[in-house]
C-alpha cells in the first residue's frame, strides 16, 4: 500500500476520530464548568472501554478474513469474494447512515451532551453515566473505522494501520488545540469538506461491492454448482452489464495518478454499466440528502474551548 491508497483510510479515520474527540472535549468542558473534574476519570474509562471494544471487533474481523484465506478447497475464493461484498455493503450502509445522522444532529449535539452530563453530575453515581456517554461516542466511531478497514480488506496491512493511526493522531491533536489551547478552527468548513470526501469515497465502495459480488457469481458459474444461470449478462461480466470503458492502457487504476482517482473518487480503469448506474444513484440520493441537510442545519458542531 502506498501513500495514495492510504489516503481514504486517513480521511475516514480523521473524520470519525475527530467526531469522537469533540464529544470527549465537550464532556470535559461540561465537567470543568460544573466544577466536577473529579469525575474525569470516568471519561477516560469510557474512552478506554470504547477503544478496547473497537480493537476487539477489529481483531475478530481480521481473524475471520484470515480464516477464510486459509480455508482449503476450491470454494474458498467464492467465499472470500462474498464476504468482501458483504462487509463492503455493511460499510456503505453504516457510513452513509452516520454521515446523514451526524449532519442532522450537528446543530443540537453539544446541547444534548451538556444535558446528559448535567443530569449525570446531579445524581449519585453519575460517573457511570458519563462513561457510557463517552463509550458510545468512541465505540460508534471506532466500529465505523473498523468496518471501513475490513471493507478495504486491509485489516492486517501495516501501512493501512499506519494510515489509520495517523488519522486518529491528527484528530487527537486537533481536539487538543481546540479544547486545551483555545485555537479557533472552522469546524463547520472542516466537516463539510470531509463529509463530501467521505461521500465520494463511500461511492467508490459501492463500485467495489458490485465487483466482488460479480466475481463471486462468476466463480459460482464456473464451479459446476448449477448456478450458471446467474450470469444473465453476456460478456466478461455476470451482473455488471456491458463494459463502458477500458482505460487501462492510458490511465491504469493501480498506478499514479489513476490510483489517486480510484482511492478518492471510485475511479476504475474498467467500468461496467451497472456499476456506473449504482454509483450515480448513490451519489444522487445520498448526496442530495447530505447537502440538503447542510443547507438546513445552520451551524456545524461547535466545540467550546475550555481549559481543564
Curated annotation (Swiss-Prot):
Main location: membrane
Cellular-component GO terms for this entry: high-affinity iron permease complex; plasma membrane
Claim: Transmembrane is one of the keywords in the record: yes
Compartments, as annotated in UniProt: Cell membrane
InterPro entries found in the cross-reference section: EfeU/FTR1-like, FTR1/Fip1/EfeU
A Pfam family reported for this protein in Swiss-Prot or TrEMBL: FTR1
Cysteine-cysteine disulfides: none
Single GO BP term: iron ion transmembrane transport
TM stretches of this protein: 46-66, 82-102, 159-179, 190-210, 271-291
GO MF: ferrous iron transmembrane transporter activity
Source species, domain of life: Bacteria
Annotated membrane topology: Multi-pass membrane protein
Keywords: Cell membrane, Membrane, Transmembrane, Transmembrane helix
Family: Belongs to the oxidase-dependent Fe transporter (OFeT) (TC 9.A.10.1) family.
Matching NCBIfam families: EfeU/Ftr1 family ferrous iron transporter subunit (TIGR00145)
UniProt name for this protein: Uncharacterized protein slr0964
Amino acid at each position: 500500500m502506498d501513500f495514495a491508497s492510504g489516503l481514504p483510510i486517513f480521511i475516514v479515520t480523521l473524520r470519525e476520530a475527530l467526531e469522537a474527540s469533540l464529544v470527549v472535549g465537550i464532556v470535559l468542558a461540561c465537567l470543568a464548568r460544573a466544577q466536577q473534574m473529579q469525575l474525569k476519570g470516568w471519561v477516560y474509562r469510557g474512552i478506554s472501554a470504547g477503544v478496547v471494544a473497537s480493537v476487539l471487533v477489529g481483531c475478530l474481523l481480521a481473524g475471520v478474513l484470515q480464516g477464510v484465506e486459509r480455508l482449503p478447497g476450491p470454494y474458498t475464493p467464492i467465499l472470500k469474494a462474498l464476504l468482501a461484498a458483504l462487509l463492503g455493503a455493511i460499510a456503505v450502509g453504516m457510513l452513509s447512515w452516520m454521515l446523514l445522522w451526524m449532519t442532522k444532529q450537528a446543530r443540537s449535539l453539544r446541547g444534548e451532551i451538556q444535558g446528559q452530563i448535567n443530569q449525570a453530575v446531579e445524581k449519585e453515581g453519575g460517573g457511570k453515566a458519563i462513561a457510557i456517554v463517552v463509550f458510545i461516542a468512541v465505540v460508534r466511531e471506532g466500529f465505523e473505522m473498523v468496518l471501513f478497514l475490513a471493507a478495504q480488506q486491509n485489516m492486517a496491512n501495516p501501512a493501512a494501520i499506519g494510515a489509520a493511526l495517523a488519522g486518529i493522531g491528527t484528530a487527537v491533536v486537533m481536539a487538543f488545540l481546540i479544547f486545551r489551547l483555545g485555537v479557533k478552527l472552522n469546524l463547520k468548513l472542516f466537516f463539510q469538506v470531509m463529509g463530501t470526501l467521505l461521500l465520494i469515497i463511500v461511492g467508490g465502495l459501492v463500485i467495489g461491492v458490485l465487483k466482488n459480488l460479480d466475481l463471486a457469481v462468476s466463480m459460482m458459474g464456473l464451479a459446476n454448482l448449477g448456478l450458471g444461470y446467474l450470469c444473465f449478462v453476456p460478456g466478461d461480466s455476470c451482473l455488471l452489464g456491458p463494459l463502458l470503458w477500458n482505460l487501462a492502457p492510458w490511465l491504469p487504476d493501480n498506478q499514479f495518478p489513476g490510483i489517486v482517482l480510484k482511492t478518492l473518487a471510485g475511479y476504475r480503469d474498467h467500468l461496467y454499466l451497472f456499476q456506473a448506474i449504482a454509483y450515480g444513484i448513490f451519489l444522487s440520493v445520498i448526496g442530495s440528502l447530505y447537502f440538503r441537510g447542510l443547507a438546513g442545519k445552520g451551524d456545524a458542531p461547535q466545540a467550546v474551548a475550555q481549559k481543564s
